[in-house]
Amino acid sequence: MLRMLRTKFYIILSVLMSVLPLSGASQPVSSYDAVNPFIGTGNEGNCYPGAQAPFGMISISPNNPFDKKEDVASRPGYKYSRTEINGFGMTHFSGVGCHAMQDLQFLPVTGSLDRTPVGDRFAYRSKFSHEHETAKPGYYAVSLPDYQVDTKFTAMPHSAIGEFAFKSADDAHCVFMPTNSANGIGAGELHIETSSMTVTGWVSTGGFCWRDPHDRPYRVYFVAKFNARFSDYGTWKGREKFPRQSNVAGDDIAAFVSFGNRKDRPVKMKMAISYVSIDNARQNLNAEISCWDFDGVHSTVQDEWTDYLSRMTVEGGTEAERKTFYTAVYHNLLHPNIYNDVNGAYMGFDDKVHQVEPGRKQYANFSLWDTYRTSSFLQALLAPKESSDMIQSLLHDAEQGGAYPNWSMNNVEYGVMNGYSTFPFIAAMYAMGARDFDLQASKDMMKKVSTSYLKCKGYQGWVCLDDYMRYGYVPVDKHGHGASMTLEYCIDDFSIAQICKAAGDSSAYSYYMDRAQNFENIFDKETRLFRPRKQDGSFLSPFTETGTDGYNEGNAIQYFWSVPHNMDAVISLAGGRKFVEDRLDAFTSKINRGWAPDQPYYWLGNEPCFGSAFVYNYLGKPWKSQLLVRKVLSSFNDTPDGLPGDDDAGAMSALYVFSAIGLYPCIPGIGGFTVTGPLFDRVQIKTGKGKVLVITAQNAPTVNPYIQSVRFNKKDVTSTWIPWHQLENGGVLDFVMGNMPDRHWGTGSNAAPPSFY
């Protein structure tokens, strides 16, 4: 009997040990904890690590001092290799290739205030160490040893709260230095309200991409409220300090508030912004952070981030791969940004205050030339409601500004890239299920701005539209980027056609599908490349495949693959599959990071080459794409230098996400994916229809890049293309991977992704 009891005991114990984690065992971290906001803050990427809610208007992030008009640290405000912080900004733009935002800078300090911060980014800088710095979604903390103060921040959509733990008995202060926006300011005001322990103000700034702050300016307003009374206060006007002065205005202003000795008595600061008024900023703050509960706010935003990040989860892979993946998803939940206040008001492209429709949000900050290729698909997949509002927001911008914006920041069109990328962005989101917007009005606006030259708020629009319609291409002697602009416009036309088709406008669909084939007009049979062409019909000469004349951020060989809607025609024009395969072999024999517009190789660091890794699927050699995509994935990692180029508001990160799940949206405006095989054992996606799509992979590790078989809901899949409508209702997509190519799978006569004529 005793032996029987002992036997039963050991059986029960062994079962418990098999199902309960050992205290020392390593457990997979949550999707929230896997995010590392420092990824992409190094040499390339241009990301920032600060505290922000999903798509939040406000982002509290550190800014590094820089002494040039533009350097690598000035773009997002932060560069991981820098050792000093000169303040915390309230607005930032992630991944962009030019310096932007970093508005309404402030810094907690101690000691004397004997230097003016006006126009001096070094005046109150402090050293910092990454050993005493933490960043998680919605949270940022860092110690500033020069002032013996520990800072931490967390954020809601329009507001944020910070806590400053002073460890010195010296007088504690908070310095406001708005002239340290990325491009300075054109005007501004600061007001100190001692009775309510509040500082308010506004600045006018702008000048994206090396421009003056007076060029295409926007206004941003703020309110900052403290939980400690002011022992002193004052302002600066230029280099002159004015103690006990409460108000200051101009383009050379700063202010301070003091708290006396606050050693071991933390000071809290609540802040909010608005693009409408100080009063609206105050309403935003009162609505979102009514008390001083830092931990409560942090818990709320953590829950919100967890909700978004749980919409696409992965299992398997290495810890570094999971961190890279979830951070890439995180990067695609930062922009575009909520632009309306809690009362629904927002500043329109006509510089008038408008009211967003109940239940909707107005969004701003669209890096469309970058994001239409990848982020548009991912955001519509993860956040269809928000994506619908983004489409409606762009329509509002067009109605108020006269035409769709192409590359906008806040309520200003900067137009820094070629093409008219609003259209493929909208068409991609629609194709992926973001459909709660005014389709007919959007279609009508697209037709309007693509047949008559109209500007958005006085800028950009469909550049060279008359020439494009007359010649069927953009002459390089009329615009220096004529070749790449023509290719982009073909993608734009194809995207407009898809919206026209969805809206039931068949004649317009046919018209734009015809225009979408204009790439043929710049194809040079001699070089078998898309070559810049002049008004007289002659091709640009001299010409080489790596010359950049006629192309925006690239060259002829890099743009050769830029007809995603009709790759069959490109293959035919160039002489057939064998020639294109040999060209692609040479092109992808090296992968370039960083800046490489004059190189003959696959430039992973910039958007026009994103889709070229998947072209083998059109050539009947899908195993070559499968291996190449794994090489692409290996160019990313979970370090600050982990991105191979500018993240461009999430575009680069979205390339990683789709490559890692083995499904890439290769055709702008079409809902579907070309297939390359997942990196992870299991991927789970919550679709916009409330269903769950599960992707599984046997033998998924990096050493097994090749697809052996694919089944969806237990039925064989033999094509390298899967339409989204087959997946969006959920199901199980099973892959079997291997370390040797299967030269039969995906090679059938109908196995390639579609081309549209």
Residue ranges and their predicted role:
Residues 1-28:
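Bacterial Sec-dependent N-terminal signal peptides
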Residues 27-376, 380-424, 430-487, 495-521, ...:
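Accessory carbohydrate-recognition regions in carbohydrate-active enzymes
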Residues 492:
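ATP-dependent phospho-/nucleotidyl transfer catalytic cores
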